[in-house]
Amino acid sequence: MVEQDFICSDSFESSGIVEWNSPSNIALVKYWGKKHNQIPQNPSISFTLSKCYTNTVVEFKPKKNTQNEIHFTFDGKENSDFEKKVNTFVKSIDKYSGFLKNHDLYINSKNNFPHSSGIASSASSMSALASCLVDIESQITSNDNNFNLRKKSFISRLGSGSASRSIEGPVTLWGKTDAYKESSDLYLSLIHISEPTRLRS
């Protein structure tokens, strides 16, 4: 799949609430920098941390004014720094999700782990938000689950590179490599392990 496959100019006006839990992840093979438009310099592999996740709730309503508004709270409290980042992110993806321009968003996010614990909350928070937005969009599309998974990862990547690997697990690959046919720079690939690998001393 290529970038154009993820562009959705279709729009609608509706209201509702969506919710998503998304895990953080820990890299086994890190990526060392990114090229233009969040393309990784090298492939990376990670485990998702299913017990460490971000819960995000998005309420969407038809916009009240000419310009749509995005309101963000973290754990029920206003956070201006986070709100600026979320606003920048959401406005940067509107060409991929046409409904965004017609709706006000009320977003609340919270982690089930300490924010400064060393666990990558940016990965889980961006992937949770992207998952909510793609779920809203799915109201007007007939895309299958596999496409939606890839689009969630694609959108997550634009907010945080490592977030692209937090959509699903337990083992994921992000970055094109000849060693894995299904790999892509644009979204995650699931690595299927048929049985546990035993480490020998």
Name what the model sees in each region.
Residues 1-117, 131-141, 145:
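ATP-binding N-lobe of GHMP and related small-molecule kinases
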Residues 35, 136, 163, 200-201:
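Generic hydrophobic alpha-helical segments
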Residues 44-46, 121-122, 160, 201:
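Short linear Ser/Thr-Pro motifs
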Residues 95-191:
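Gly/Ser-rich oxyanion-binding loop with an adjacent helix/lid
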Residues 192, 196-201:
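Single conserved hydrophobic/aromatic residue that forms the stacking wall/gate
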